[in-house]
Regions:
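A conserved regulatory-domain signal marking ACT and ACT-like small-molecule sensing domains
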Residues: 524, 538-540, 551, 555
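Long, mid-chain structured domain cores
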Residues: 134-136, 531, 536, 540
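Nucleotide-activated chemistry modules centered on ATP-dependent adenylation/adenylyltransferase
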Residues: 1-189, 194-517, 542-550, 558, ...
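Glycine-centered, phosphate/nucleic-acid-interacting loop/turn motifs that mediate DNA/RNA or nucleotide
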Residues: 527, 536-537, 561, 570-571
């Protein structure tokens, strides 16, 4: 059973918002709560049919169910074997005939709840895990799916009403875009996970077509089983790969540190930028593309705030539609198992979510499974993390890594490139609107590309001997004067128009200049700037010598300055590597 409730009062919200009354802490007046409702789910267990169900009374046998959980996922035979080994069962196949389901730290075996300690499992030594894997490998070949398949068939029959309800609603939602977008102006964001798999199938059914593009963001960190599934999927769907061929994940970890829960730079560098380029290539100069995504509210706290339709915060030319946004894991698996569509075999191993296998957002269970099923890759990744911990002078690097300290890391303290975020300057003594900067990178001809968002570059109006370059607005008026010789680190900037790029004061205008100077000093070619430009004006690529080329197309740039203002201090890497500053 599902219903919208107020997260504060846990009451029903038939009007679409909470109507309960609160006392305002400041005024002492009575005010209506009006909290945005969230979806609450109640699932039951039918002891006769031996399956979880959505309705309190079983549609098949009429039995009244017992409450079991708010969400649940099936446990496949492969995970059953691993569970038996972890519980030290004599027979690793002892759960073969049982109906086994999972909800985070709880397994439900024929309706009986079994609590397990994921922390304890993940705390096992690598040698212990290696021994478990050896036993698992000998047993897994003996798995018989017969009983599992029969149990799943009963699950499907019992929950047929729920399947029809969520499927019909999602298909109708997708069909609502028929008159607003053509098939040539839309795509499915495909990750190889269960949610994008279901979303893809719903889109196919809604439009009765396999012609919709699928963009697969290859972070280079996907599970091996994801690549296998993507290959199968590509035989029946139009899949466009999106991959950053210029960057290497391990090299970037050494340069700017591993991604953390707070700053998952890997998504921007290896997914967002690559997908932006693929969209630009596939959809040319179109500025409003529809992307169907498998976002769901109950995946995480951050996603619980997403709207069903929204403008993408990362890729600005993209409208995002989420057909299954209110679905639970229960609903997703009900759809997959009912339709019989192919899915990623990583779920059979016990993964509840499939993304990057070493993601800092992965839970302890996913981390443990990677130790079991990707032992060599995990050991190598751990060595990279330990080396990083030593580099930033952690007192006990191995404990820092094993206790997950790297996942909570914030900022760039201890990382060399973070020092480039510091902008040294002082106001000019003779001109109130001028500033003298000491750059950490010598001025090159490409330096002036970063000032194109402010206007049109003219290197001929100024004193060439002094290295003066003028920036003009569209009427030909001077808005900036840049003075600095090629090869020098000294730069003088004179702001001729305090309203530069929508600035409200000289200080704000100078802040926008500093955004671009920071970008010039810190750019590693992450392509975040490309992603925020909906006009395809920004082009970034890595050159053969390892340096980065940053170009802005004068013809395409509309001087909106989104590439200047979008990220804190103008640069995504600067945002990732924030450091404590003196003073």
């Amino acid at each position: 059973m599902r219903e919208l409730v107020c997260p504060k009062h846990m009451c029903k919200t038939p009007m679409g918002k909470c109507m309960e009354w609160d006392i305002d802490e400041i005024t002492g007046q009575k005010v209506q709560c009006q909290e945005k409702p969230v979806m609450s789910t109640t699932l039951y267990w039918c002891s006769k049919c031996n399956v979880p169900m959505y309705e309190e009374r079983c549609p098949e046998c009429g039995s009244k169910g017992e409450y079991i959980a708010t969400d649940i996922r099936p446990v496949f035979p492969e995970e059953k074997v691993l569970l038996a080994l972890l519980l030290n069962k004599e027979d690793p196949l002892c759960f073969e005939e049982a109906s086994v389901w999972n909800n985070t730290n709880y397994y439900f075996i024929d309706g009986e709840r079994l609590q397990v300690s994921i922390k304890e499992f993940n705390g096992k030594s690598l040698e212990e895990i290696k021994a478990i894997k050896a036993k698992y490998s000998t047993c897994v070949s003996e798995i018989d799916y017969t009983k599992f398949d029969a149990n799943i068939q009963k699950f499907i029959e019992v929950n047929q009403n729920r399947y029809n309800e969520v499927t019909d609603e999602a298909i109708n939602f997708v069909q609502g875009y028929k008159d607003r977008y053509s098939l040539e102006n839309m795509f499915v964001s495909f990750s190889g996970g269960k949610d994008s798999t279901v979303t893809s199938d719903i889109v196919r059914r809604a439009f009765s077509s396999n012609k919709v593009y699928h963009i697969f963001g290859d972070t280079t960190l996907e599970f091996p089983l994801t690549y296998e599934y993507k290959k199968r999927f590509g035989r029946e769907h139009r899949v466009l790969p999106a991959k950053n061929y210029e960057k290497n994940f391990e090299n970037l970890c050494k340069q700017i540190g591993p991604p953390s829960r707070v700053m998952r730079w890997c998504c921007t560098v290896f997914k967002t930028g690559a997908i932006t380029q693929t969209i630009a290539s596939a959809f040319k100069n179109k500025t409003n593309i529809l992307s169907f995504q498998g976002i769901r509210h109950n995946e995480s706290l951050s996603r619980s705030k997403y709207d069903r339709e929204s403008k993408s915060p990362k890729i600005t030319k993209q409208t995002v539609a989420a057909p299954i946004i209110e679905w639970t894991d229960f609903d997703v698996w009900l759809y997959i198992l009912t339709t019989g569509i192919d899915f990623n075999d990583a779920y059979r191993l016990g993964y509840s979510r499939v993304g990057c296998w070493c993601c800092p957002n992965n839970g302890a269970w996913s981390e443990f499974l990677s130790k079991v099923h990707m032992y060599d890759q995990y050991v190598h990744w751990r060595e990279i993390l330990v080396d990083f911990a030593k580099k930033i002078d952690k007192p006990d690097p191995e404990e820092y890594v094993d206790q997950g300290g790297w996942k909570a890391r914030q900022g760039g303290n201890g990382i060399d490139i973070a020092e480039r975020s510091i902008i040294s300057y002082e106001p000019c003594a003779t001109e109130d609107n001028a500033f003298n900067y000491e750059l950490q990178r010598p001025i090159t001809p490409e330096f002036y590309e970063l000032f194109k968002p402010f206007g049109y570059i003219n290197p001929h109006l100024g004193n060439e001997r002094l290295g003066e370059v003028y920036v003009l607005d569209k009427k030909g008026k001077v808005v900036l004067v840049l003075q600095g010789r090629i090869g020098s680190t000294k730069l003088k900037v004179t702001i001729k128009n305090e309203r530069l790029a929508g600035a409200t004061s000289l200080k704000v205008a100078d802040g926008k200049i500093q955004c671009q100077l920071t970008k010039y000093q810190m750019c590693i070619g992450c392509k975040a700037c490309e992603s925020v430009c909906k006009h395809n004006a920004v082009k970034i690529k890595e050159l053969e010598d390892g340096s980065t080329s940053y170009k802005i197309d004068d013809e395409k740039c509309v001087r909106c300055t989104e590439c200047v203002n979008h990220y804190n201090a103008g640069c995504y890497v600067r945002k990732v590597l924030t450091i404590k500053r003196e003073g």
